[in-house]
Amino acid sequence: MPKAPDYSELSDSCTLAGGTARFSGPLHRAWRMMNFRQRMGWIGVGLYLLASAAAFYYVFEINETYNRLALEHIQQHPEEPREGTTWTHSLKARLLSLPFWLWTVIFLIPYLQMFLFLYSCTRADPKTVGYCIIPICLAIICNRHQAFVKASNQISRLQLIDT
């Protein structure tokens, strides 16, 4: 009768999947020392950067089209709004008149917030996850300021006894 394999010496899923062959090196050791949240954080950062590279390529291809449409919009003679003009056409015309750098800033702030959140998930201390997100950061700063004011008020109420 065949003997059941003994998996007691195999410590992680990589060695279980790979059989008896063990991967070695500093990257593998660092990966094994991370907990699940950190591993998923690094995978999320990698996928986010990969998707970002694809999106930036697409955006810069679109940039040429955007510039062409914006120039066509500017070169047209301003006409009186017609009754047949829909609100979507009017909105599109107004949005095309915004400069490209403004669109970049509008999309860059949430992009950086998401990246910093994913990066904070890679930290070893779970209490530090999300500290770099703007609303959380502002709440922490305000809370620290209130605690400082409260402590300084308590100190000023103490009467010093001169001996």
Curated annotation (Swiss-Prot):
Q: Which Pfam families match?
A: TMEM251
User: Where mainly found?
Assistant: Golgi
Q: Which UniProt keywords apply?
A: Golgi apparatus, Membrane, Transmembrane, Transmembrane helix
Membrane topology of the entry: Multi-pass membrane protein
Give me the segments passing through the membrane: 40-60, 100-119
- Give yes or no: UniProt keyword Transmembrane helix: yes
A single GO BP term for this record reads: lysosomal transport
The cellular location(s) given in this protein's UniProt record come to: Golgi apparatus membrane
Subunit architecture: Interacts with GNPTAB; this interaction is important for proper localization of GNPTAB in Golgi stacks. Interacts with MBTPS1.
Family statement: Belongs to the LYSET family.
What this chain does, per the entry, is described as:
Required for mannose-6-phosphate-dependent trafficking of lysosomal enzymes. LYSET bridges GlcNAc-1-phosphate transferase (GNPTAB), to the membrane-bound transcription factor site-1 protease (MBTPS1), thus allowing proteolytic activation of the GNPTAB. GNPTAB is involved in the regulation of M6P-dependent Golgi-to-lysosome trafficking of lysosomal enzymes. LYSET is thus an essential factor for maturation and delivery of lysosomal hydrolases.
Q: Which named protein is this?
A: Lysosomal enzyme trafficking factor
